[in-house]
Design a protein with these regions (language model features):
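Conserved phosphate-binding catalytic cores of ATP/NTP-utilizing and phosphoryl-transfer enzymes
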Residues: 109-130, 309
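Short Gly/Thr/Asp-enriched flexible loops that form oxyanion-binding sites at enzyme active sites
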Residues: 78-102, 274-283
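Conserved phosphate-binding/catalytic loops in two-lobed NTP-binding clefts
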Residues: 108-109, 264, 281-306
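A contiguous, well-structured pocket-lining segment that forms one wall/lid of small-molecule binding clefts
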Residues: 69, 185-264, 273-287, 314-317, ...
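A short helix-loop
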Residues: 2, 8-9, 16, 26, ...
């Protein structure tokens, strides 16, 4: 079964074709990230306009790369939540028109479910149940994936997202957008123990908070500038990355130990962070658990992950009609 996946929840306009939820046929991404970088982050209006400009050609290119036409596709899957609402609506409305015109089923896909499904593309042998840390520009979650379309949230971000914290710290340190790769690159030559950053405390054993950590970095930099001192950018980047990776890994591994989970996954943009991957791998080895990590190309937003999850949503009977609307927020375990 061939699924066309369409993604437009943030600043990537993406389309892909995936067979049976696990086998990539084509994958095309058009991004406005360079334009967004001029403003130090995503400007929703710019993102929406670029989606409207790029989406038709992006979908056409995905079909062309697969040597297919829309008639060869079995269903059209699209991100409908969560995300920047203007951006989401571009993808949803395009997918509705395409599916209706071609007489194909329309499959709504939750963006974070898509991130989890990116693991199926890298590891076709992976099957639920497993425990997954989803960390991205949106809320982080520790999720028990009980079945292909059944989820139980154990922990979540209570304030700022991990990706958002990376972007804010990058701006504070004068590093370019997007913040995740910039901070990681700067951290390579830094001392992760130079700055003593706090570990935020939060209610809920598996919940995470990054607002205080982000503020601590901003204050440290501001105070140094007020004193006329040089900010050690590489050391601050390394110290921040170490703290955020330690927090996320510790929560995931604690949940794994408490639930006796023997299969762990990472998903989302922050899953590309090398230090986080290392900490999770090391901790899982001590627990006797196996870790599955998505390829770096699947960590950011892409259409392939939406097509992959779209296959399982379709098999589960999650078919939408033309009343489908985009949503800015929606729990991953919605039903």
């Amino acid at each position: 079964m061939y699924i066309l996946g369409i993604e437009s929840s943030c600043d990537e306009t993406a389309a892909a074709i995936v067979e049976d939820g696990k086998h990539l046929i084509s994958n095309v991404i058009s991004t406005s990230v360079k334009e967004q970088a001029l403003y130090g982050g995503v400007v929703p209006e710019i993102a929406s306009r670029r989606h409207a400009e790029y989406i038709s050609a992006t979908v056409q290119q995905a079909l062309q790369d697969a040597n297919m036409s829309i008639a060869d596709v079995d269903a059209v899957a699209v991100t409908f939540a969560p995300g920047l609402i203007g951006a989401v609506l571009v993808g949803v409305n395009f997918a509705k028109g395409l599916a209706y015109g071609a007489g194909k089923p329309l499959v709504p896909v939750h963006h974070l479910r898509g991130h989890i499904a990116a693991n199926y593309l890298t590891h076709p042998q992976l099957e639920p149940p497993f425990l997954c840390l989803v960390a991205s520009g949106g809320p982080s979650h520790i999720v028990q994936v009980e079945d292909w379309c059944k989820y139980h949230v154990l922990g979540r971000t209570v304030d700022d997202a991990a990706g958002e914290a990376f972007d804010k710290v990058a701006r504070t340190l004068g590093l370019p957008y997007p913040g995740g790769p910039s901070v990681s690159q700067a951290a390579k030559t830094g001392d992760p123990h130079y700055y003593k950053l706090p570990t935020p405390h939060v209610e809920g054993k598996y919940n995470v908070s990054f607002s205080g950590l982000k503020t601590a970095v901003v204050n440290e930099v501001h105070n140094a500038q007020q004193r006329g001192e040089e900010v050690r950018v590489a050391d601050m980047a390394a110290s921040f990355q170490e703290r955020i990776a330690q927090i996320l890994a510790k929560k995931l591994l604690a949940a794994a130990a408490d639930t006796n989970a023997k299969t762990l996954c990472l998903a989302g943009g922050v899953a590309a962070n090398g230090r986080l991957r290392q900490l999770v791998n090391d901790g899982a080895q001590k627990l006797g658990a196996k870790v599955y990590l998505p390829e770096l190309k699947y960590c950011g937003d892409n259409g392939a992950m939406i097509a992959a999850q779209g296959y399982y949503e379709f098999k589960d009977g999650n078919i939408a009609d033309l009343t489908l609307n985009g949503l800015p927020t929606l729990a991953i375990d919605y039903r």
